[in-house]
Regions:
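Formylglycine-dependent sulfatase
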Residues: 2-476, 480, 485-515, 519-522
Length: 524
């Protein structure tokens, strides 16, 4: 296994690669052809395991001025959906298909956004979490640095370094990383100030500096691993939040909900879901346990804060390049807040390299305010994501709130639409499945778009279908639940018993979709 490069070596190699690319005939011709190209740049930013109410512009108390700034200049969506889990969401984002159709991370019989945009003359760049068996440079991206796997230690995803304790880890196996087409298993950074969120931000800025002055447009996908566990953050960021969560999760949920109502994100007629029945009341906790819980949420908040700082640095680079006006920025999360308990180092507090801790169900319940359930569930707490779009050239009125329904499968169609790129019927000699998503551009332009007749979800034992205002959802062996989402935004009043025919018809619709996906995946 090759030894991981130092940062200096990596930048030198990147410069050499850039020189070679500049001299390559096809790419040089592409740049000349793009000399008068006025298509938008596309900056796609994804958070990892972040709840609906965590950021400031969605009612949260966490400091996120840069993401909030995107909302002030653009549109916040209140009914946009992901796939409830990391890899399925990423497969749908990249392909515009349901993950069940394309073998999830394999993305078979599908073309990626990067492949389509690259063929249309875009420079395609990525950093961060890939979470698929292949590598980004094999699926249309010109450049890549990041975690090809699902999660890792933020301070050191590899082997123990001299003078340091062993890095906290979830499993014994090493996590895959990659620099361009070179894989590292493990990847052990030599820089002891390495921190994944900062490393991804730095790489994005470096690539913008390298390619941002080209005449043609760029597509940059930044897939942060924050605030996915383990809970790791810089001490100075943690200090900003230490003690603020001694108010407890009950008071936090109430405060967030009240801010959301005041912001107009949710109507007061929709009561927030009650505290998860498996979560104790904060006031019932022994005093000696409260400080530890406060620390967990402080570290989680610090991770989001640091991500927002990085987003601000990337946006500053876009402005420096003079490309802010015609850059479409999309920000979202891959699923809801995570209730998993993966506390591998119970004797090491969250934050430093040697720890491996999770935020756990009580705080995840608060992160997903006002909704029920969590990551991996197809109730709103698992699938409804903050979704922010900024595009100054097109979105003239900032601070908008849209209640039109969107889905992660719509991002591919949106990118094709704004880029003027044709979605192919075949790619590389292989037939490509028809696109499932629909463009969100009409919403950006102040119009009401023709949405989907039905939207579907399935992860593990959880499943759901939404048709208009009706949503049918179930988990495990539990019976289907039916909700009127116009009257009951937080899924508190199950109507399955009083509308059995509607529930049965929607269940059949879901079963037919699932069978179609199985056939398509089997043939891929």
């Amino acid at each position: 296994m090759p030894k991981p490069q130092t940062r200096r070596q990596f930048l030198q190699a990147a410069a050499g690669a850039a020189l070679g690319a500049a001299l390559a005939g096809p790419l040089a011709r592409r740049a000349r052809a793009a000399a008068k190209d006025d298509r938008p740049n596309i900056l796609l930013i994804m958070a990892d395991d972040m709840g609906f109410s965590d950021i400031g512009c969605y009612g949260g108390e966490i400091r996120t001025p840069n993401v909030d700034g995107l909302a002030r200049r653009g549109i916040r969506f209140t009914r946009c959906y992901n796939n409830a889990k990391c890899a399925p969401t990423r497969a749908s984002l990249l392909t515009g298909m349901y993950s069940q159709q394309v073998g999830e991370g394999r993305m078979s019989k599908a073309v990626t956004i990067a492949e389509v945009l690259k063929a249309a003359g875009y420079r395609t760049l990525m950093t961060g979490k890939w979470h698929a068996p292949s590598l980004p440079v094999h699926r249309g991206f010109d450049r890549y640095f990041g975690l090809a796997d699902g999660c890792c230690n933020f301070w050191n995803p590899g082997k123990q370094r001299p003078g340091e304790p062993p890095p906290g880890r979830k499993w014994a196996r090493w996590r895959r990383w990659a620099i361009e087409d070179k894989e590292f298993t493990p990847y052990t950074p030599e820089d002891k100030n390495f921190y994944t969120t900062d490393a991804f931000t730095d790489y994005a800025i470096e690539r913008l500096g390298e390619y941002g002055k080209e005449a043609g447009p760029f597509f940059l996908y930044v897939a942060y691993t924050a605030p996915h566990y383990p809970l790791h953050a810089w001490p100075e960021d943690i200090a900003r939040y230490r003690g603020k969560y001694r108010m407890g999760w009950d008071a936090l949920r109430k405060a967030r909900y009240e801010r959301m109502v005041k912001m107009g994100l949710i109507a007061k007629r929709y009561p927030a879901s009650p505290r998860d029945p498996s979560v104790p009341a904060w006031n019932d906790l022994p005093e000696e346990k409260r400080d530890g819980w406060d620390l967990k949420m402080a570290v989680y908040a610090a991770m989001i804060d640091r991500m927002d700082q990085g987003i601000g640095r990337i946006l500053a680079k876009v402005r420096e390049l003079g490309r802010e006006e015609n850059t479409l920025v999309i920000f979202l999360s891959d699923n809801g807040g995570c209730a998993e308990n993966v506390n591998k180092t119970p004797d090491v507090p969250p934050g430093p390299l040697a720890s491996y801790r999770t935020v756990d169900k009580p705080w995840a319940n608060a992160s997903n305010t006002p909704f029920r359930k969590y990551k991996s569930w197809d109730h709103e707490g698992g699938i409804c994501t903050p979704f922010i779009v900024s595009w100054p050239r097109v979105i003239k009125k900032g601070g908008q709130i849209s209640r039109q329904v969107g889905h992660i499968i719509d991002i591919m169609a949106t990118c094709c639409d704004v880029a003027g790129a044709a979605y192919p019927s075949e790619y590389g000699g292989t037939k490509v499945l028809p696109l499932e998503g629909k463009s969100l551009r009409p919403i950006f332009e102040g119009k009401t778009r023709t949405g989907h007749d039905a939207l579907f979800w399935q992860f593990g034992k959880s499943k759901a279908v939404r048709c208009g205002k009706w949503k049918l959802v179930a988990n495990g062996s539990r019976p289907w639940e039916l909700y009127d989402m116009e009257a009951d935004r937080c899924e508190l009043n199950d109507l399955a018993a009083s509308h059995p025919d509607r529930a049965a018809a929607m269940a059949k619709l879901w079963n037919d979709w699932a069978e179609r996906c199985r056939r398509q995946a089997k043939s891929s």
